[in-house]
């Protein structure tokens, strides 16, 4: 042992590599399961180490943590071309997670593939289809009744194909992943844009569309454009009213909603140790709002503490042995560096209408007065996948206790969403839930609820101007309640609680006083709460369905008359010709998020039925021609009508069409319906100034052409009444622009260039009609 250990040490020094534990160099001494639910699926730190060593020798430089985990999962580390921001990496993720709104389409596609079982550990989580109305138990019962067909499909499909199934009421996908599946060094993909939440436990967890998930479940290497790495150095320490949420609210204000596009945000520095594991998850979760591929923190004692408290001390011990691979190398290079002194950071609140409009809480009241935003807060809402941990609930309860001690309750309506059944049961046991009820709160079901528009709001009418404050992640127009006049702000749960008690945006809990029931003034003290329960977590009800060992007799039925589920028909292949005389369905003015393209809320019930869900295509996008939403000119009849109706008219009459968009088109959710719908209704291309990462990939997967103006000013050359011809598809090649001929009604023409990011594999998707079609072609060879 000694001579070999010495040899390894000398070799590492010669290569400029940090010295590793002898145990990790030799072998993985003990097999440790990835989760309690999959006892025969093991963590492969030995393979991670081997791949990192291969890549390190090739690159001959220190590696960031992001690079270690990503490159450590390369399909072919010895030969993979690696260049940040340019090359496409072929990766082997460790697992897949899907929420119920996206799992329907993902499983329908997997069924279409003809494969018998998933190739990697996979889970389905029921959290998106539960509407908030009356409170937890009643809303859950109603959801089970309304969504019985969908839940039965997902449960039986999971059983048939080897996918774990978390029943409705189990909690929000990302909290369940953090509690059970995420671990340092994991590469996990999830069909939800807030999958990066797992970065709080040291994993690279990336939001993708369902077609990407199908690739991984089918055992096909997953492609990701080699990400750049943005370093955020944290110094100082959090204290007082400042919370982990304020870190990402500050970063969002710096980088904006697209500043992280194509990059992993990697937090490091001495300030990291002052943040709890669930606090790190909060920061990583909301990294989706800056367009980041994902975010990650280095493994530390806070993660070890969380792993141990959630029954995974064996994983923590193994991570300790391999810790050198779970932190960045000294001297590693970041493409951009931001430094934040946590000791100087103030509580923030971002909004309205965009998550990157950052304000210190101390200033938002005066800004609101100046801008004409409603000062009175109608509703305060805490929870969501971003902020529903035990610590979040504890800090909010600490604020509420102070108000109750002075005889006060919330002036605003107040709702609480526990992140999981485990969190719900534990805060009930420890008294937090009752304190939050006593101050005026309603505890909702363990689900997404109002955060994704599942909110049957009764206190206002549509079009009524009002303000809400949430601890959620997104505040796009109409996202939470479908009211475009709701001014939504995002902040930490404790600030939401304080503002709900005060009832106004003008209240600053750091400096302002409240008046108690006895008429005496008092100031709220900064909340203090345990990051983890002192006793063990209470798991609550058992909500997990294991896939059976033998599923040969399992049936998965989809009724041909169902309004909720629809088996998929393959999209048509490319006909080998250029796209001639495309009609412009809509030229979008300004921001066009995934909520504008295909809203959630009441439309979630159609996520498994492509034709029905297509009836909401682009109904939120603003038409530049008339400055209206869901009103576009039919080029044949010359009448204005809803976008989906016009698209269906074009499809019925054999008219192919295109969408023209602005900057960061498709920011927001990972749901691939935003790509499936335009493809289903006859769309062929989306041309914009720039795309959000996930949406661009989703469009490619479904055989559409996401293209960008070589000169962004060319956006202004195109008018809604023009026709477009896209040339160069016969010689379609990576890095080679396509030509676009703009044909104006007066007979004049202009030619512009359109860029794309297709690689060879993705071009094959286009030619086959979709990535799924291409998968079937390869299976038949």
Curated annotation (Swiss-Prot):
Region: Disordered, residue numbers: 524-561
Subunit description: Monomer.
The protein's Enzyme Commission number: 4.2.1.3
Protein name: Aconitate hydratase, mitochondrial
Pfam families: Aconitase (PF00330), Aconitase_C (PF00694)
Record-linked InterPro entries: Acnase/IPM_dHydase_lsu_aba_1/3, Acoase/IPM_deHydtase_lsu_aba, Aconitase/3IPM_dehydase_swvl, Aconitase/IPM_isomerase, Aconitase_4Fe-4S_BS, Aconitase_4Fe-4S_dom, Aconitase_dom2, Aconitase_mito-like
Cell compartments where the protein resides: Mitochondrion
Gene of this entry: ACO2
Biased composition (Polar residues): 551-561
N6-succinyllysine: residues carrying this PTM: 31, 50, 138, 144, 233, 411, 517, 523, 549, 573, 577, 591, 605, 628, 689, 723, 730
Cellular component aspect of the GO annotation: cytosol; mitochondrion
Residues the record lists as N6-acetyllysine modifications: 50, 138, 144, 233, 517, 523, 573, 605, 723, 730, 736, 739, 743
Keywords: 4Fe-4S, Acetylation, Iron, Iron-sulfur, Lyase, Metal-binding, Mitochondrion, Phosphoprotein, Pyrrolidone carboxylic acid, Transit peptide, Tricarboxylic acid cycle
GO BP terms in the entry: tricarboxylic acid cycle
Metabolic or biological pathway: Carbohydrate metabolism; tricarboxylic acid cycle; isocitrate from oxaloacetate: step 2/2
Family: Belongs to the aconitase/IPM isomerase family.
Binding-site residues, [4Fe-4S] cluster: 385, 448, 451
Cofactor: how and how many bound: Binds 1 [4Fe-4S] cluster per subunit. Binding of a [3Fe-4S] cluster leads to an inactive enzyme.
NCBIfam families hit by this protein: aconitase_mito, PRK07229.1
Record: transit peptide: 1-27
Reaction catalyzed: citrate = D-threo-isocitrate
Residue numbers bearing the Phosphoserine modification: 559, 670
Entry-linked PANTHER family: ACONITATE HYDRATASE B, ACONITATE HYDRATASE, MITOCHONDRIAL
Residue positions where Pyrrolidone carboxylic acid is found in the record: 28
Domain of life: Eukaryota
């Amino acid at each position: 042992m000694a001579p070999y250990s010495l040899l390894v040490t000398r070799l590492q020094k010669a290569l400029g590599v940090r010295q590793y534990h002898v145990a990790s160099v030799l072998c993985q001494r003990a097999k440790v399961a990835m989760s309690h639910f999959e006892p025969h699926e093991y963590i492969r730190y030995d393979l991670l180490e081997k791949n990192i060593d291969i890549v390190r020798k090739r690159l001959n430089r220190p590696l960031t943590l992001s690079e270690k985990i990503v490159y450590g999962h390369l399909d072919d580390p010895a030969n993979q071309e690696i260049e940040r921001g340019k090359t496409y990496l072929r990766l082997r993720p460790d697992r897949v997670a899907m929420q119920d709104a996206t799992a329907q389409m993902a499983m329908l596609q997997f069924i279409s593939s003809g494969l018998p079982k998933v190739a990697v550990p996979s889970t389905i989580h029921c959290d998106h289809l539960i509407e908030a109305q009356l409170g937890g138990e009643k809303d859950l019962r109603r959801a089970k009744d309304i969504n019985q067909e969908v839940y039965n499909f997902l449960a039986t499909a999971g059983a048939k194909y080897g996918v774990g199934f978390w029943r409705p009421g189990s909690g929000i996908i990302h909290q369940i992943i953090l509690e059970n599946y995420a671990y340092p060094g994991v590469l996990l993909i999830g069909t939800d844009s807030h999958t990066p939440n797992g970065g709080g436990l040291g994993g690279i967890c990336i939001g993708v569309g369902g077609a990407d998930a199908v690739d991984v479940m089918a055992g096909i290497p997953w492609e990701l454009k080699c990400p750049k790495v943005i370093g955020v150095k944290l110094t100082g320490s959090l204290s007082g009213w400042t919370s982990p949420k304020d870190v990402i609210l500050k970063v969002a204000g710096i980088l904006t909603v697209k500043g992280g596009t194509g990059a992993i945000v990697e937090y490091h520095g001495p300030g990291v140790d002052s943040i709890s594991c669930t606090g790190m998850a909060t920061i990583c979760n909301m990294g989706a709002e800056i367009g980041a591929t994902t975010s990650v923190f280095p493994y530390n004692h806070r993660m070890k503490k969380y792993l141990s408290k959630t029954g995974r001390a064996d994983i923590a011990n193994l991570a300790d042995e391999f810790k050198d691979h779970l932190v960045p190398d000294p001297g590693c290079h970041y493409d951009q560096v931001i430094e934040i002194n946590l000791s100087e950071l103030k509580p923030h609140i971002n909004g309205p209408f965009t998550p990157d409009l950052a304000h210190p809480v101390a200033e938002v009241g005066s800004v609101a007065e100046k801008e004409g935003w409603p000062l009175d807060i109608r509703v305060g809402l805490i929870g969501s996948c971003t902020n529903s941990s035990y610590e979040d609930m504890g800090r909010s309860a600490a604020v509420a206790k102070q108000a109750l001690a002075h005889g006060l309750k919330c002036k605003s309506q107040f709702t609480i969403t526990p992140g999981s059944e485990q969190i719900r049961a534990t805060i009930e046991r420890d008294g937090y839930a009752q304190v939050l009820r006593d101050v005026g709160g309603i505890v909702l079901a363990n689900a997404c609820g109002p955060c994704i528009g599942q909110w049957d709001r009764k206190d206002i009418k549509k079009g009524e101007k009002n303000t809400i404050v949430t601890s959620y992640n997104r505040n796009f127009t109409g996202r939470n309640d479908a009211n475009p006049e709701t001014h939504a702000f995002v902040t930490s749960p404790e600030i939401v609680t304080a503002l709900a008690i005060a009832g106004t945006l003008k209240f600053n809990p750091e400096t302002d006083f409240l008046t108690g029931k006895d008429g005496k003034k008092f100031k709220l003290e900064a909340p203090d709460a345990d990051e983890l329960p002192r006793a063990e977590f209470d798991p609550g009800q058992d909500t997990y369905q294991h896939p059976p060992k033998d599923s040969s007799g399992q049936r998965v039925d989809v009724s041909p008359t169902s309004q909720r589920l629809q088996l998929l028909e393959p999209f048509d292949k490319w006909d080998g010709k250029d796209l001639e005389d495309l009609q412009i369905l809509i030229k979008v003015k300004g921001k066009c998020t995934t909520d504008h393209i295909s809203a959630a809320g009441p439309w979630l019930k159609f996520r498994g039925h492509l034709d029905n869900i297509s009836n909401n295509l682009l109904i939120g996008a603003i038409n530049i021609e008339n400055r209206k939403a869901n009103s576009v000119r039919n080029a044949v009849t010359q009448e204005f009508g809803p976008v989906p109706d016009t698209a269906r008219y074009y499809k019925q009459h054999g008219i192919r069409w295109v969408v023209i968009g602005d900057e960061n088109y498709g920011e927001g959710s990972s749901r691939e319906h935003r790509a499936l719908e335009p493809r289903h209704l006859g769309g062929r291309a989306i041309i914009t100034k720039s795309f959000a990462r996930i949406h661009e990939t989703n469009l490619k997967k479904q055989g559409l052409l996401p293209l960008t103006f070589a000169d962004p000013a060319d956006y202004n050359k195109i008018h809604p009444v023009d026709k477009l011809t896209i040339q160069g598809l016969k010689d379609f090649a990576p890095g080679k622009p396509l030509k676009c001929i703009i044909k104006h009604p007066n007979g004049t023409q202009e030619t512009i260039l359109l860029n794309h990011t297709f690689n060879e594999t993705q071009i094959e998707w286009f030619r086959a009609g979709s990535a799924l079609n291409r998968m079937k072609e390869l299976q038949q060879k």
